[in-house]
Amino acid sequence: MASEPTTVTITGGGGPIGYALMFRIAAGDMLGPDRPVRLRLLEIPQGMRAAEGAALELQDCAFPLLVDVDVTDDPLTAFNGARIAMLVGARPRTAGMERGDLLAANAGIFGPQGKAIDAVADEDVRVVVVGNPANTNALIAAASAAPDVPADRFSALTRLDHNRAVGQLAEMLQVGAGDIADVIIWGNHSATQFPDVSHAILADGMPVLEALAERLGGQDQATAWLDDVFIPRVAKRGAEIIEVRGSSSVASAANAAIEHVRDEQLGSGRGVTSAAVVSHGEYGVPEGLVCSFPVTSRGDGHGYRVVEGFDLDDRARRRLAASVEELVAERDAVQALGVL
């Protein structure tokens, strides 16, 4: 077991996703069986009791890897020495709220958190934003931590979209989820995202597009299923879960966040996965936007890197461009608020 514990900060620590995260992190699911962790739970004052109750439960679990748990409503205390920051807490959109109002509310959350990360976090901190709108919230946090914390240390969660896409393909093709590689989520974590299977392959080397055509009776049928069923269902899966379950995704979101950090820290293995990272102009995406790309990580401390070289046909380029247009509009709205 490593001698120095890794400090992991979870914002929204008293909320349902934070609750689902903390026990798996303490059990070693995120950083492995040999890395002790110190958990810091950040909450707003009215959420403190829930977070304190979760901390009591963590103590009762007696996890060997869990060194200690701190609960606080002070960002400077929460992010002090943080090596990994998982920004879960966000202002949800309510009925009648305009996008500009939502962005302004979240700027008031993620801006100060970015400043606190800059002030007191570990010099090699890595940050993943889970709270929506995740891509632009990550942009806000990164801008607020600049220039001392490089923007490349910030990412936003699209692993949930990635996993949803893999799950839908696995169900259609009657294969295990682990038998599918190189699915890509492009763009924003929103209804404009583009789940791309044109480069995906099965464990036996068969392209997923061929497997779909074989199962559905031809390439035209496969294309129709992708356009009319698969892409809309992945993009709107969150709304479907709310309708069926009566509340938003919790366990699947927490699982995706854990996998995002695990692969970034320990290595992503075979093929590519998806994460929203700061663009450096890859695939024509404007520099500085936080956009979902195909990524890999060697687990060597350098985080995710965008994998270039995937061909995009006209259809894919149009879908990516539409999602990028939305990201640009969100960035411009935040700039108009004077945040960036």
Model region roles, listed by residue range:
Residues 11-14:
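N-terminal Rossmann NAD(P)H-binding glycine-rich loop of SDR-like oxidoreductase domains
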Residues 22-32:
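Histidine-anchored nucleotide/phosphate-binding helix
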Residues 30, 34-82, 332-335:
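Conserved N-terminal Rossmann-fold NAD(P) cofactor-binding segment
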Residues 147-151, 162-340:
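C-terminal substrate-binding/catalytic lobe of Rossmann-fold NAD(P)-dependent dehydrogenases
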